Amino acid sequence: MSLLATLGLELDRALLPASGLGWLVDYGKLPPAPAPLAPYEVLGGALEGGLPVGGEPLAGDGFSDWMTERVDFTALLPLEPPLPPGTLPQPSPTPPDLEAMASLLKKELEQMEDFFLDAPPLPPPSPPPLPPPPLPPAPSLPLSLPSFDLPQPPVLDTLDLLAIYCRNEAGQEEVGMPPLPPPQQPPPPSPPQPSRLAPYPHPATTRGDRKQKKRDQNKSAALRYRQRKRAEGEALEGECQGLEARNRELKERAESVEREIQYVKDLLIEVYKARSQRTRSC
């Protein structure tokens, strides 16, 4: 057996399990290969009708009876006895390394599963914050600027100016005559008050309004309290009157029942006396 065949057999036995080596060919029991022949010798024997390699004569030509040749396949069959039908080969034992790796992998999977099961659930995502409500539009108030009337100078006619000028000239010519006083100008009119109220009330008025509003609220609360108490008193009084009437009715019934019981007692006493007299007379 050649070295390559031996190495191939050892490699197959190392890679495959022991139960699966039955189909391998035992290279040690194969018949040895015949010695190589020269090509001319094989061809010449075939052409001349001579003997083939085994030395046996052929019935016909050298290429027609090879299908009828019997071959012994016992050397190629496995040495182990064949398994009965319906039975499966026993599984090969797994190596300890694979078992250790499988157990480690199983432990790791169990640890990961426990970790994911013990982990606290994630909180639900918080809803996005609502957008702020739109601000109401500011009321557009027509801002009217207060109008101020400028004082107009008094209108003097040209005749008045000429008269004043002539008087001044005449007064300067006459000695001892005091000059005329200048014409009195009317006082400037006071600026008109703005017709529109200020946008913000005065703080003093706001304080007074708050006090008045609180006073009104206290009055209304006291009035509601008195009304509620009056209604409760009326309800209690009506209930008391109803209970008193019921009490009187029950008392009258009890008195009537008591009179009936006394009447029955008197009847029983009379009956007993009558029977006793009859028994005595008999």
UniProtKB/Swiss-Prot annotation:
**What is the recorded post-translational modification?**
Ubiquitinated by CDC34 and UBE2B in order to be degraded by the proteasome. Cisplatin inhibits ubiquitination and proteasome-mediated degradation by inhibiting the interaction with CDC34. Ubiquitination and degradation by the proteasome are inhibited by NLK in a kinase-independent manner.
Which residue windows are transmembrane per the record?
none
**At which residues is Phosphoserine found?**
256
MF terms from GO for this chain are: chromatin binding; DNA-binding transcription activator activity, RNA polymerase II-specific; DNA-binding transcription factor activity; DNA-binding transcription factor activity, RNA polymerase II-specific; kinase binding; RNA polymerase II transcription regulatory region sequence-specific DNA binding; sequence-specific DNA binding; transcription cis-regulatory region binding
Q: Which residue positions does N6-acetyllysine occur at?
A: 29
Coiled-coil annotated spans: none
Q: What induces it?
A: Down-regulated by pro-apoptotic stimuli. However, the pro-apoptotic cisplatin increases protein levels by inhibiting polyubiquitination. IL1B increases protein levels through protein stabilization and increase of translation efficiency.
Q: Give start-end positions of Pro residues composition bias.
A: 120-140, 178-194
| Main localisation | cytoplasm
Task: Spell out the residue ranges making up region: Leucine-zipper.
Answer: 236-250
Q: Where in the cell is it found?
A: Cytoplasm; Nucleus; Cytoplasm, Cytoskeleton, Microtubule organizing center, Centrosome
Query: What keywords were assigned to this record?
Result: Acetylation, Activator, Cytoplasm, Cytoskeleton, DNA-binding, Nucleus, Phosphoprotein, Transcription, Transcription regulation, Ubl conjugation
The keyword Kinase is annotated on this UniProt entry: no
Matching SMART domains: BRLZ
Against SUPFAM superfamilies, the record matches this protein to: Leucine zipper domain
Q: Region entry Disordered: which residue ranges?
A: 116-152, 173-238
GO annotation, cellular component aspect: centrosome; chromatin; cytosol; nucleoplasm; nucleus; RNA polymerase II transcription regulator complex
Q: Where is the composition biased (Low complexity)?
A: 141-150
Span list, region Interaction with PTP4A1: 119-217
Q: Where is this region: Basic motif?
A: 210-230
What protein family is recorded? Belongs to the bZIP family.
What does the function comment of this entry state?
A: Transcription factor that either stimulates or represses gene transcription through binding of different DNA regulatory elements such as cAMP response element (CRE) (consensus: 5'-GTGACGT[AC][AG]-3'), ATF5-specific response element (ARE) (consensus: 5'-C[CT]TCT[CT]CCTT[AT]-3') but also the amino acid response element (AARE), present in many viral and cellular promoters. Critically involved, often in a cell type-dependent manner, in cell survival, proliferation, and differentiation. Its transcriptional activity is enhanced by CCND3 and slightly inhibited by CDK4.
Subunit composition and interactions: Binds DNA as a dimer. Interacts with PTP4A1/PRL-1. Interacts with CCND3, but not with CCND1 or CCND2. Interacts with HSPA1A or HSPA1B; the interaction protects ATF5 from degradation via proteasome-dependent and caspase-dependent processes. Interacts (via C-terminal region) with NPM1 (via C-terminal region); the interaction leads to loss of association between HSPA1A or HSPA1B and ATF5 and promotes ATF5 degradation via proteasome-dependent and caspase-dependent processes. Interacts with NLK; the interaction stabilizes ATF5 at the protein level in a kinase-independent manner.
* Record-given protein name: Cyclic AMP-dependent transcription factor ATF-5
What species does this protein belong to? Homo sapiens
